[in-house]
Amino acid sequence: MSTHPTGNTGGLIEVRSIDFIPDAERHGGLLSQFTLWLSANMQITAIVTGALAVVLGGDVFWSLIALLLGQLIGGAVMALHGAQGPQLGLPQMISSRVQFGVYGAMIPIVLVCLMYIGFSASGSVLAGQAVAQLLHVDDAAGILLFAAVIVVLTVCGYRAIHFVGRIASVIGIVAFVYMFAQLFANHDIGALLANRHFTLASFLLSMSLSASWQIAFGPYVADYSRYLPRSTSSLGTFFAVGLGSVIGAQAAMVFGVFAAALAGSGFAHHEVAYIVGLGSTGAVAALLYFSIAFGKVTVTALNAYGSFMSMATIVSGFRGKGAVSSRSRLLYIFGMICVSTLIALSGRHSFLKEFTAFILFLLAFFTPWSAINLVDYYCFTRSRYDVPALSDPDGRYGRWNAMAIAIYVIGILVQLPFLSTHVYTGPLVDALGGTDISWILGLVVPAVLYYVGARGSRRSIPERLILPLERGEAQP
């Protein structure tokens, strides 16, 4: 697997791309993982996602419990992916070639790219609203200004994103503490919690919202832990990533639940203004608008950076290369942000409805991939990967792994009868009282099928991690 020259590994702009990170370039600690994922989740889109639990018919009390359960389940799945990063030193999706084949991995990777674009677009709408309020411009100008910041940060890469994550985590904590204090001081929260009307459909819908939120990070979470020293504890990485993500998302979604319950029908299309209005007016409101915009910087940069990784993985699979040029990197990043910005500009007036459909439908495509990847890594291969073979269609992992691809497709199909979104509603949803259990099947069925299939296969698993240098390739 070819690699970039190291260059100035401590410089402002990252040199590495999808290639293996050698031990000499590993750095960072678990605290940076916690702050990165805390800041990535403690933001406006998570608030809106929590609000959907109430907007779509749930009460406050049971919505809070369901969201927490979904966070814990989805967060565990997401953190298991994150723990792979230090051991492999590779981006998340390129490691999917072990399960799907060098060409076969492009099937889930293409869908991952769509995910990045969708999340970036929806996040840009909310960040654009905050920038517009802060600078007294229209929403379109706010979206464009926000996109320009994301381009710069993403081009700088890994170190810059982690640095901004640390700053954003501090700003986010201060902002949320203030907004919660204002919320509890000025509103009767007890009355909201006392108004209970449990329905299984609403409860599982709320679980689906938070579980899908967490699982959707799975395809790129290891991208941001791959520079950690290989000696980093896998359990420590699991908890640093998982706790940061779950705590940040749950705090934001709890606030969203209360905000939507207080706002009623006035929440839709005015999400940012209403949330800030709960906190304060005047100069303090301006600071809250800034915190909202800055809070979106981290996660949108993650999306753009992950998109670059995924696009580079697709192209390198056909070219048999393990790295991409700096020019290609810039083109991938700029292209992705342009597309997501255009979507944000064209869809900003119907954001809430479209985002609901997007995030729930998205889950059907990523739970099977996640199940296959995790079962393969933790039950069979661990960190025993042949890194050079990841770029060789004629190597150990081949072009296509028919078994994994078939199980992935089955994992999607088995969910369809039970899937309930604005995009598609399965035929068995009404029989279950409107309850959506598709994501549970999407995790369990592919996991069981892949475990059985992999145990019976004759594929070759190396005895240890094989690095590029051991195949006589250029010294990284």
Protein language model regions, located:
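Transmembrane alpha-helical segments of multi-pass small-molecule transport proteins
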Residues: 109-113, 134-156, 170-181, 210-221, ...
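Hydrophobic, membrane-embedded alpha-helices of multi-pass small-molecule transporters
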Residues: 28-47, 180-186, 196-259, 282-304, ...
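Hydrophobic alpha-helical segments and their helix-loop junctions in multi-pass secondary transporters
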Residues: 137, 170-196, 210-215, 254-262, ...
